[in-house]
A protein has these predicted regions:
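ABC-type nucleotide-binding domain
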Residues: 15, 22-23, 28-297
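Cytosolic ends of transmembrane helices, especially the final helix of ABC transmembrane type-1 domains
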Residues: 1-15
Length: 297
């Protein structure tokens, strides 16, 4: 069940509508049973024959255009490289295209034009199960299902107790779990209503850590912190980011001052990029958004 990761929750939570998928790409229609059977068979053969060459975490968008329908492009001629281990923040107003970039990277959709490569390989050539082992997504709204703690970390994959506990230790969630009535066997309610928002966030980090992904995608994963776990979360996040490529969808610009580069999007176009200080000095859209947030706080 290696394919079941947080990626499968992205389409329910990220902000742009995705119900039109079947209209845009008829090959996904459930009515086309024969085509689906053939596609599934080909996919299984691809997965058997695919030798994983992914190891670095380089992401490359080559002249990527994307429209959910017709020629109404929400991404326009995106052309950039994210180097292995680099931390990038995506910034822009609502509807700028931040979520669409993540959807394409997770292969919830394919580019209308152009291509996306990971470590030099077109992601359309990478079986989804491999892509999802290589990439972890951590969202603002952490989805927990009714079940014990260890199952909420492993998501049904065959990890040992030692591996689960090691992931919990690395992400500062072990001490909280040990205080629960039955430790890792404690039953959580659906959506984790019997634990705090910060504790849910730490469990999401443990989910990512156990899979040891090379690429992390975070949708402002530190947006809803409670005071009791804020320091633990920041420490766990710093450790999780070490040595990995990361893309952060930023809503609070104060949280991304230390990333390597900031990509500023407007109406699907990449209009600015640079460090926090470089973009402030340029006095463009990023500087305007930053100053507005500072005034608001």
């Amino acid at each position: 069940q290696g394919g079941f990761t947080a990626i499968e929750r992205v389409s329910n939570i990220l902000d742009e509508p995705i119900e039109i998928k079947d209209q845009v790409s008829p090959k996904f229609s459930l009515l086309e049973n024969q085509g689906s059977y053939i596609d599934d068979t080909i996919k299984k053969l691809e997965e058997q024959n695919f030798i994983t060459p992914l190891a670095l975490g380089e992401i490359r968008f080559e002249n990527v255009w994307f429209a959910y329908k017709d020629d109404d492009y929400v991404l326009k001629n995106l052309d950039f490289v994210i180097r292995p281990g680099e931390k990038i923040a995506l910034v822009g107003p609502t509807g700028a295209g931040k979520s669409s970039i993540i959807r394409l990277l997770c292969r919830l959709y394919e580019p209308t034009k152009g291509r996306i490569l990971i470590d030099g390989i077109d992601i359309q050539e990478i079986p989804q199960i491999e892509l999802r082992r290589y990439m972890a997504v951590i969202l603002q709204e952490v989805f927990l299902f009714a079940g014990d703690v260890k199952s909420n970390i492993s998501l049904g994959d065959n990890y040992t107790s030692e591996e689960i506990e090691s992931a919990a230790e690395k992400t500062n969630v072990a001490s909280f779990i040990q205080e629960l009535p039955e430790g890792y066997n404690t039953e959580l309610r659906e959506r984790g209503t019997n634990i705090s928002g910060g504790q849910k966030q730490l469990l999401a980090f443990a989910r990512a850590a156990i899979r040891n992904p090379q690429i992390l995608i975070l949708d402002e994963a530190t947006a809803n912190l409670d005071v009791g776990t804020e320091a633990l979360i920041q420490q766990a996040l710093n450790q999780l980011l070490t040595g990995r490529t990361a893309i952060i969808i930023a809503h609070r610009l104060s949280t991304i001052r230390n990333v390597d580069r900031i990509f500023v999007l407007k109406r699907g176009e990449l209009i600015e990029q640079g460090s926090h200080q470089e973009l402030i000095s340029q006095g463009g859209l990023y500087a305007t958004l930053h100053n507005l947030q500072m005034l608001g706080s």
